[in-house]
Amino acid sequence: MNREPLFITSHESRGTIKGDREYMTRIAVDAMGGDHAPFEIVAGAVWAAAEYGVALELVGKQDRIEQCLEVIQQEGFMSPCGKAGKARRVRVDVKALDIKITHASEIIEMGEAPGQAIRKKKNSSIVLTVNSVATGSSDALVAAGSTGAAMASSLFGLGRIQGIDRPAIAVTLPTMKKPIVVIDGGANSNCTPQMLKQFAAMGRIFSKNVLGVDNPRVGVLNIGEEAGKGNELAQQTYTLLEDEKEKFNFMGNVEGRELFLNVCDVVVCDGFVGNVVLKVTEGTASLLLKMIKSEFKSDILGMIIGTLAKPFMKRIHEKINYEEFGGMLLLGVKGITVISHGRSKAYAIKNAVRVAKEAVETCINKKIAESIA
């Protein structure tokens, strides 16, 4: 399955034209990470390559990746597609795609300590995936395995953007209107006010360039709206952002109950709080959908109403389904890292590759560096 790439691979030639063909963005994918690896990961990656016109570097056990590609070429794969969410068979002509396979002899498991694991397993799939971006072989990476390993590998392998103390995870959450960004989503449990100020700057760039929000509004997640509310971190962060209110389009404190009411576009908090928000949101959304479905099945009237409401339920599911967002960008490192949910299947991986491609094309790291300078 390895073959000569169709497009130029020089890192210095990104965005140039060879002959009459423009360079194709290459995304490195950790094929061995996640609960459904490698088949669902490979399937989502090739699906994205076919739909979004990207080249791929699939990193992992070469024989298993090749087996996946062969099955996909011959049989396709089942996946929910489009707004209806109905599962259908997806067909992809794998042979027509620009795919490079990099063999990785090791895998970092979910329970391993990230820092120790990446030092011990230098030939692991996530380490080699990061190395592909670090050396310029690929433009961005997608990983659905250990979040800690993906973050640690990216931090040590790619390095931090100058002026950024710590990278942060940008989490996209749905609201009644447009999506919002919660940052940090879990990279840093202990933060300083200066770090949260940097998160605000990075979150604004993400919101503007990836989500298309003009002049994103920033808020500090807190237990009350007043300036003196919250712990020392929240109060000092409030002061820093208030001092540069126009630059950050700072709206003040945001309470948890206001999170999904579009009072701001970027919500800053430490990674401990942000990750709890993410997990509670996922759990609540899942619970509500299950409760509604259960009520629809409770009696004949419920079944009738449920049948009539099915199109509306599908649209709601689409808005709150994590698979639609694909993955979370790790902002602040010298490279594009998209971290997907460990439960991700093909559709989520396809969208994660799309997020990676958009981040490359919008030059998000360059804009972060310029904003911090």
Model regions: which residues?
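Short glycine/serine/threonine-rich phosphate/pyrophosphate-binding segments
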Residues: A37-I41, K122-G136, A140-S154, I161, ...
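Phosphate/nucleotide-donor binding subsite
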Residues: E75, V90-S138
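N-terminal phosphate-binding or glycine-rich loops at protein starts, especially the Walker A/P-loop
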Residues: G19-Q67
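Short Gly/Ser/Thr- and charged-rich N-terminal loops/segments
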Residues: R14, G82-V90
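Short, glycine-rich nucleotide/cofactor-binding loops
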Residues: I27-F39, I118, A187-K197, I339-A346
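Compositionally biased, intrinsically disordered low-complexity segments enriched in Pro/Arg/Gln/His
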Residues: R3-L6, H11-R14
